[in-house]
């Protein structure tokens, strides 16, 4: 897993070892070296460690795969079931972050940030042109449509 999520003190005071790595991609990565002895793997949905059938086969002690967020598309669920590995997520843990992200994206779209960022990176900048396509949120009626929780 990347980031300790505030778990180190709790786990180590109870006799467990917590290994944190961001080397999780490609065969032979740091995470692959530790999965052989791991009881639990904690991964994050936007920086996942993919628990493939092959990785699960090497993880003889693995009992649980935890998503520190929502989703399990980075886990081969059939392989997990075949090996009696529980796959769990921390439901609703990131609801506030998702809402903040939506507000950030709305402001980014209204201000034409993506397009202006591209123009600046290409060496251009015309303030009059930028202002013409940039708006204030004040006075707008904004609605969101959610397909999740």
Regions found by a protein language model. Name each.
Residues 1, 22-26, 45-49, 69-72, ...:
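Short beta->alpha connector loops
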Residues 1-40:
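N-terminal glycine-/charge-rich "phosphate-binding" loop or analogous flexible N-terminal tail
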Residues 27-31, 50-54, 75:
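Short acidic active-site motifs
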Residues 54-61:
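Short, conserved loop/helix-junction motifs that constitute active-site signature segments
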Residues 71-74, 89, 93, 148-149:
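Residue-level detector of alpha-helix initiation sites
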Residues 72-85:
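Rossmann-fold NAD(P)-binding glycine/threonine-rich loop
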Residues 83-85, 91-145:
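Phosphate-binding beta-alpha-beta segment of Rossmann-like dinucleotide-binding domains, i.e.
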């Amino acid at each position: 897993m990347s980031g300790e999520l505030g778990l180190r003190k709790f786990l180590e005071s109870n006799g467990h070892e917590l290994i944190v790595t961001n080397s999780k991609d490609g065969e032979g990565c740091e995470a692959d070296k530790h999965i052989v002895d791991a009881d639990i793997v904690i991964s994050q949905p936007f920086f996942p460690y993919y628990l493939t059938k092959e990785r699960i086969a090497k993880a003889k002690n693995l009992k649980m795969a935890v998503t520190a967020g929502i989703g399990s598309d980075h886990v081969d669920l059939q392989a997990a079931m075949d090996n009696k590995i529980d796959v769990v997520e921390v439901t609703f843990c990131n609801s506030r972050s998702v809402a903040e992200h939506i507000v950030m994206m709305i402001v980014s779209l209204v201000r034409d940030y993506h397009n202006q960022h591209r123009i600046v990176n290409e060496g251009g900048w015309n303030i009059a042109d930028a202002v013409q396509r940039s708006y204030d949120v004040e006075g707008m009626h904004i609605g969101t449509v959610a397909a999740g929780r």
